Each structure stands twice: as structure tokens, then as C-alpha cells.
From Swiss-Prot:
Membrane keyword on record: no
Gene: rpl6
Organism ancestry: Archaea, Methanobacteriati, Methanobacteriota, Archaeoglobi, Archaeoglobales
Biological processes, Gene Ontology terms: cytoplasmic translation
GO CC, alphabetical: cytosolic large ribosomal subunit
The name this protein goes by in its record: Large ribosomal subunit protein uL6
Length: 196
């Protein structure tokens, strides 16, 4: 029989002892606002030199407070999962701030041995032509607001959201994966060489 968890939730809200805490500094040129609470979730909005971005974070028992140029993430629960989520939330907030302040950049390389690969951007896709001599082009989706710049054999994925940039770079790498061939011999493809 399942026990009533109402008392556990109530004790989380009324407890004053902090078991895990992380403080994230907010730079002067970044404005960070917060809405919500631990039950409904928090919506954080960051505005900086590179633009604006929002992030929704929710985990009952993990609290976020903004003030005096700092973001305080803490939990009043002694459970491991709650303590771990404090670090996760702090990491997401740091990425949110870094994105609007400096932005993120992934650097990829186009590698081929015999058939020259042609890469171009078309709308919200990257078209990869003549990959290992294939007649039909391969396509990789550009996620969200990420921007792709192609310069010879170098591809740069830039943006303010690390998840959008990372997924776009992964899409490019996955689109040129050769199946049922030894990767030590068939090394053609697009590979991530530098991450933020």
C-alpha cells in the first residue's frame, strides 16, 4: 500500500535547514528575472549583450532566489536526488547567463579522402552533397535559433542556447555516419573538433 506523501512535501516547505546550496554570480551586463515557485516551477529570463533567453526549471523541494547580483539555488531536503538537482539547476542557470553574455560556439571539420563533400545551408537545414559519392544529398536539421557558418572545410555552429547549438552539431555529425563500415578505414564525415 502506498503511503501518504503529503507530510513529506509539507516538511520540505516548512523546514529551515539547508542541506545543499549553490550560488551563481550574475554579471552587471546581464539582467536576470525569475517567476514562479518550487511547485509550479521557475521561469528564468536572462537579457544580455547577445540577446535574451528563457529557461523553465521545476523540481519540488529545490528553491531558487534572485537578488544582489546573485542567484541562490538550495534545498531543504536531505535526499540525494534533491542535492543533485541543486547542482543541475545551477549548471543550467550558468549556461543561461553565459549564453546571453558571450554565446556558444561549436567547431566542426569536414573530412574526406576521395569524394569531395559539398556543404551548404538551406533554410533551417544543412545540405551535405556528394558524401562518399552518394547521388542523394543528406540533410541535418538546424535546431532553434542556432546559426551555421561554413568556411571551406570548417563549420561553425553559434548561438545563445547551448542545447540548440549542441543538438545542431550532433545532427551534422550523425548525418554523415557511415553504417556497416569500419570507422578506422572509412573516416569520411563531419566531426566536432571543439566544444564550448
Amino acid at each position: 500500500m502506498r503511503e501518504n506523501r503529503g507530510w513529506e512535501v509539507f516538511s520540505l516547505l516548512t523546514s529551515t535547514e539547508v542541506y545543499e546550496e549553490r550560488v551563481v554570480e550574475v554579471p552587471e551586463d546581464v539582467q536576470l528575472t525569475i517567476e514562479g515557485d518550487s511547485f509550479r516551477g521557475y521561469t528564468l529570463k536572462a537579457v544580455g549583450p547577445k540577446g535574451e533567453n528563457t529557461r523553465y526549471l521545476k523540481y519540488r523541494g529545490v528553491f531558487i532566489e534572485v537578488g544582489d547580483g546573485k542567484v541562490r539555488v538550495y534545498t531543504t531536503s536531505p535526499k540525494k536526488k534533491h542535492k543533485a538537482m541543486v547542482g543541475t539547476f545551477a549548471g543550467h542557470i550558468e549556461n543561461l547567463i553565459t549564453g546571453v553574455k558571450e554565446g556558444f560556439e561549436y567547431h566542426l571539420k569536414v573530412v574526406y579522402a576521395h569524394f569531395p563533400i559539398k556543404v551548404r545551408v538551406e533554410g533551417n537545414e544543412v545540405i551535405i552533397e556528394n558524401f562518399i559519392g552518394e547521388k542523394h544529398p543528406r540533410r541535418a536539421k538546424i535546431v532553434g535559433r542556432a546559426q551555421v557558418e561554413i568556411s571551406g572545410q570548417d563549420i561553425y555552429v553559434r548561438g545563445i542556447d547551448i542545447e540548440e547549438c549542441g543538438q545542431t552539431a550532433a545532427n551534422l555529425e550523425q548525418a554523415t555516419k557511415i553504417k556497416r563500415k569500419d570507422p578506422r578505414v572509412f573516416q569520411d564525415g563531419i566531426y566536432i573538433v571543439k566544444k564550448p
